[in-house]
Amino acid sequence: MDLRATSSNDSNATSGYSDTAAVDWDEGENATGSGSLPDPELSYQIITSLFLGALILCSIFGNSCVVAAIALERSLQNVANYLIGSLAVTDLMVSVLVLPMAALYQVLNKWTLGQDICDLFIALDVLCCTSSILHLCAIALDRYWAITDPIDYVNKRTPRRAAVLISVTWLIGFSISIPPMLGWRSAEDRANPDACIISQDPGYTIYSTFGAFYIPLILMLVLYGRIFKAARFRIRKTVKKTEKAKASDMCLTLSPAVFHKRANGDAVSAEWKRGYKFKPSSPCANGAVRHGEEMESLEIIEVNSNSKTHLPLPNTPQSSSHENINEKTTGTRRKIALARERKTVKTLGIIMGTFIFCWLPFFIVALVLPFCAENCYMPEWLGAVINWLGYSNSLLNPIIYAYFNKDFQSAFKKILRCKFHRH
């Protein structure tokens, strides 16, 4: 999103955004006595062209692979991946429709395509970048519903619902990109024919920055925060259930014996006895008994004889080996749960960290600069870095949302090896 602002300190459209440190063209021509560029300027243009060209090509290639993978691999054709595919299409539009003109503007450090193309460029820039950001919100919202209401959302998670979310992102994008073309801009925006800048009207600045970034940012932080809490709760709950199930399943198979309570101390009848109070938690199948917390040992007297068989229970000293095994299993299970929590934190951290890293500097400058253009100064090279940092999010999105997915990785390998068979 190419938001630029003019400053009284620099009449050549010093921007907060993609204007770079440039050598004055007239001075360059006078210094050489010809129309040739001075060496530093030529070197800058070559290096910048190569770097930005590589960024654009990588972004086109990466997002194209995501779209192709979803289109060709049936296993990837689900609602969650439809949103990722739509994000890839949006970022592909940024890479094809916006970035080439932005790169030309960056390299030449002046706008050479006329005012009408400038208006179209700004509108496409704001539309596509805003839609890309809002797609991230749609993906976060879909994941939030899926993890907090998994049973009911299975039926609600339909292609139609995905289409509604995608349509909303584009409608909001249009509502932010169109107003400047309808007159919501200041007179100074077109004062310099060599500059192509977004509307610097204060009202539009607040409207566009909050609609395109700050509100989506808050929404994503809330959603991913709740997703993390829900995921952590589910992981820990699963571990507790598994441990409880393991403990309750520790039964003693006693099918050969029959239990009879002692009847008036009759030593001939079959009996079971214990040294302490016995509290079995619940009976097991096939004549087995689950041990209780106070259970020490179980003495079995066969029905047809007086021979006794003593079976140690899990919490007796004789069964310490069973306890050790159980403790090791529990410890391993908890380590796995902790690893899953860390992976969840890492994944959410990468998603939010990349988004904030790419766009927050841009929108801070976009919001502040129009209100203090006469008093604020920012080096042109820094404005260029901030501008292209935002654009680079279109390159990083397919890496974060698709390339880390094993199913996508498999599809990408098939595409690259040209051994793809739809199945």
UniProtKB/Swiss-Prot annotation:
Keyword Iron: no
Residues modified by glycosylation: N9, N12, N30
A UniProt-annotated Pfam family: 7tm_1
Sequence motif DRY motif, residues: 142-144
Domain of life: Eukaryota
GO biological process, one term: adenylate cyclase-inhibiting serotonin receptor signaling pathway
Localization (cell): Cell membrane
Keyword annotations: Behavior, Cell membrane, Disulfide bond, G-protein coupled receptor, Glycoprotein, Membrane, Receptor, Transducer, Transmembrane, Transmembrane helix
Cytoplasmic side: 69-82, 142-161, 226-347, 405-423
Motif (NPxxY motif): 397-401
TM spans (from-to): 48-68, 83-107, 117-141, 162-183, 203-225, 348-371, 380-404
Family recorded in the similarity comment: Belongs to the G-protein coupled receptor 1 family. 5-hydroxytryptamine receptor subfamily.
Function: G-protein coupled receptor for 5-hydroxytryptamine (serotonin). Also functions as a receptor for various drugs and psychoactive substances. Ligand binding causes a conformation change that triggers signaling via guanine nucleotide-binding proteins (G proteins) and modulates the activity of downstream effectors, such as adenylate cyclase.
Protein's recorded name: 5-hydroxytryptamine receptor 1A-alpha
Source species: Takifugu rubripes (Japanese pufferfish)
